[in-house]
Amino acid sequence: MSVVGVDFGALNTVIAVARNRGVDVITNEVSNRATPSLVGFGPKSRYIGEPAKTQEISNLKNTVGCLKRLAGRTLDDPDVAIEQQFISATLVDVNGEVGAEVTYLGEKRKFSATELIAMFMSKIKQTTQAEVKVAVQELVLSVPAWFTDKQRRSILDAAEIAGLRPLRLINDTTAAALGWGITKLDLPGPEEKPRRVAFVDVGYSNYTCSIVEFKKGELSVKSTACDRHFGGRNFDKALLDHLHKEFLGKYKIDIFTNPKAVCRVLAAAEKLKKILSANQQAPLNIESLMNDIDVRAMITRQEFEAMVEPLLAKVHVPLEQALADAKLTKDDIDIIEVVGGGSRVPSVKERIQAFFGKQLSFTMNQDEAIARGCAFSCAILSPVFKVRDFQVQDIINYPIEFTWEKDADIPDEDTSLVVFNKGNVLPSTKILTFYRKQPFDLEARYTNPEELPGKTSPFIGRFSIKGVHATEGPEDFMICKLKARINIHGILNVESAYYVEDQEVEEEVKDENGDVVMEGDKPKTRKVKKQVRKGELPVVSATPSLDPAAKNAAIEREQAMIMEDKLVADTEEKKNELETYIYDLRNKLDDQYADLASEEEKEKIRAKLMEVEDWLYDEGDDATKAVYVAKIEEIRALAGPVVQRYFDKVEAERQALQEKLEAEKAAKKAEEEARKAKEAAEKAAQEGAKDDEMTDADAPKPVVEEA
């Protein structure tokens, strides 16, 4: 099982994997550490991620970006109108959900936001599997803290359509906080004052501040505040608007009448912004922008800051709100940790620092911090990965109430109740009690619709409690208990319902110290009424999630498109293989194969190559995979004898070389053995001579006597 964390961004998506006792950010097929969050459609297949970015300018009307900001939205939402400014494809209604109308496989098609996100998730899955070499199903996904129940359900549905099972949808800044805290060994103990950190995330499309308290082995989010329309793209848009006016006056061209020109200027504006983050001025040059006109401009940092002053004037708002919700002051904050690509703009950093009156901290990778935090979260939740135990306690950002119809038998009954308040711990469970004689319905909705993003409906879900009936008793009410839970994803459900009965039971009497009071040798008891669980009640839920039939149909469509994409990719690969084979064989006929084929054979092969090449660049440009394979086999069949002669020649040369080497090796071995034998003989002779000398020295000397 893999341990994967995904920072699903509006501009780019970053994938992190926990492995080798650490967390690695993986690269995509072109070795980039971030994959463009784009889905494009063409006449033969889809372009997702890097291919979509490559094709974007030439395929504007069929390329969809800002995918996550469309999740769970409707076409009439004011926020969707804002998103249309940043999305080149046409946004339309698709069965009550916003989607895009594109031309795919030569015909007009509509895809919902959930389907578009599922397509991108399939790409993320493929990229991850190519890196980790195992099947990927479970992961942790990041979402903005301001996402509602409906938006979170849309992301979950999309992931399931792509064959993924998110273990958690984690808020962006919570993921960053987890990545920051889990590696710290000096966090305060349970009885000490917590370390308070403000995590400020200035991303491509939104700006978030979370106040988080850390203690050893745990983090607790105290508050989160957001500006949904403050990010890097808004700075790019300010530059775009300025350049539009400048080009209109200087070159008499209106780029807003040409979508491709807008796209090119927007890309140039993004580069300008990055250059101005490190320099006092930056040039802009675009060749043949419109009507064969080359445009030039020079922007200073001072001019840029004047353009974005309306944005800079709002920097303090989420910071103030986060502190107010946490009931803290600036002095209570120990560290201000800043992440997100948008935070590289110097004036943004200056405003944040001026607000807190403290130095900012940049100890985390601004582009990858959230993905790493997601990977850590996945490791904690994974049963197969051992990681330091670290508790993550997030909060609910919008209060939720339940409403119901008044029971005729209970005239003074309330008809609504705020069950989950803003700031409650997430996940969270509450038990609701109802006295009923017949089945009844409840509706869950957000208490303050004006706090929700755009024109989001406050409706969360409708829950019907079945199996309720009058009982045989003096009051004849059934006591119904409902278990309402906001789960780890931040999604509300009535998980179960059951009924209880009041019964008298014997209970031991305890004194003020908690010890059982004795009566003689037996514990003293008393009769008390307690509610005893007697049985389950069926719950029928109606929520914005896709129903099983719709989800299965979406899964089938996605799998069919994946197979179509694969067939197109395989066909293109075979086409390239055929083209390469033609060039390669033609060159070899004049090189390696020159002496191995007769002129007649060469002419036949050259003629065949010319014929196939002409076909390839004419009617064969759009052939099927099988046809390309057949053409390759035709050429191989004709050139086979020549190629075989070359292989035979190479093999003969290899064998001759091998025999030569073996002969040289044998000769060398014999020479070595002869040398060793000679040395051994000489050594033996020397030892024999030495032994003779020793023998002579030990022999008795002759005695000479006088006559």
UniProtKB/Swiss-Prot annotation:
Q: Where is the composition biased (Basic and acidic residues)?
A: 662-692
Instruction: Tell me the InterPro entries matching this sequence.
Output: ATPase_NBD, Heat_shock_70_CS, HSP70_C_sf, HSP70_peptide-bd_sf, Hsp_70_fam
Q: What induces it?
A: By heat shock.
Q: Where's it found, cell-wise?
A: Cytoplasm
Mind listing the GO molecular function terms for this protein? Answer: adenyl-nucleotide exchange factor activity; ATP binding; ATP-dependent protein folding chaperone
Region (Disordered) location: 662-707
- The coiled-coil regions, if any, are none
Q: How is it modified after translation?
A: The N-terminus is blocked.
Could you tell me which Pfam families the record lists for this protein? Answer: HSP70
This protein's major location comes to cytoplasm
What UniProt keywords apply to this chain's record, in alphabetical order? ATP-binding, Cytoplasm, Nucleotide-binding, Stress response
Give the GO cellular component terms, alphabetically.
cytosol; nucleus
Q: Name one GO biological process term.
A: protein folding
Quaternary data:
Binds hsp30 independent of temperature or substrate.
Could you say which protein family the record assigns here? Belongs to the heat shock protein 70 family.
Listed name of the protein:
Heat shock protein hsp88
